[in-house]
A protein has these predicted regions:
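Catalytic-site signature of metal-activated, phosphate-bearing donor transferases
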Residues: 68-76, 93-236
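Active-site acidic Asp-centered loop
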Residues: 35, 88-89
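Active-site beta-to-alpha loop of glycosyltransferases that engages the nucleotide-sugar donor
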Residues: 2-21, 36-37
């Protein structure tokens, strides 16, 4: 079974080296795609992601992809000869146990695409309760195409409930959050300045998701698996 991994990266220098090093050896090759310039917003100063990724053993491609799905599809093409493509972002982590379960599941998996349930992490030490309903597609056959953001052109289902990711989407400093929301693919879907000032900086704890507030109804203390806690992934 040949498995490759694709990660889209822009301004993810804090997460990227730790993310790449936590990927198990059964993933044959790691590909990091860096869009330059970003999909939205002004170009940021180079944060060194390319060098960091290469030092962690990844192949890096830089290109001015106009949107998220075109960038993801570049990864699909790169791994055309593989059995599976894992499309996981630099702020999405699996525990050792979840990696093992994912490997064993893929040995007999028969669907073209799989999404995963997630712990959505916030600030320093918190997560959404209950978990966000959105399930990102992270496993596909290389023939599957992304059509918009993380949507695909094939049927898909969800991985077994005991396989989850720990998504550090909102586990960032004030500066990191502003850079994220002003450049990512949802930057045109909400008033970023209003949300940043009146939700994020106001330190609200209920109904805080930027595009669908009720998707993160409240925050509770998070308890990471020990191996992820040891990576020091929370912001300072």
């Amino acid at each position: 079974m040949r498995v490759g991994l694709v990660a889209n990266a822009y301004n993810e220098a804090r997460f990227l080296p730790k993310f790449l090093k936590h990927i198990p050896d059964w993933v044959e090759e790691k590909l990091v795609l860096i869009t330059d310039p970003p999909w939205y917003g002004d170009k940021l100063e180079d944060d060194g992601s390319k060098v960091l990724a290469e030092n962690a053993g990844a192949i890096v491609l830089k290109f001015p992809w106009p949107n998220e799905h075109d960038q993801r599809n570049a990864g699909q093409s790169y791994f055309a000869d593989y059995d599976w493509v894992l499309t996981i972002e630099p702020d999405e982590f699996l525990s050792n146990d979840d990696w093992r379960k994912l490997h064993d599941f893929l040995l007999t998996a028969d669907k073209p695409a799989y999404a995963v349930k997630q712990h959505v992490l916030w600030g320093k030490g918190y997560e959404s309760d209950p978990p966000e309903d959105f399930v990102p597609i992270i496993v596909t056959r290389p023939t599957v195409e992304f059509t918009e953001k993380r949507n695909v052109n094939s049927n898909w289902t969800t991985l077994p409930d005991d396989i989850k990711i720990w998504h550090f989407a909102w586990a960032r400093s004030d500066e990191e959050i502003w850079k994220k929301i002003s450049h990512y693919s949802h930057a045109v879907d909400f008033d970023i300045k209003d949300w940043y000032e009146n939700v994020w900086l106001a330190r609200k704890t209920e109904n805080v998701h930027p595009t669908t507030p009720e998707a993160i109804p409240r925050l509770i203390k998070a308890k990471l698996p020990p191996e992820l806690e040891a990576l020091n992934l929370w912001p300072k």
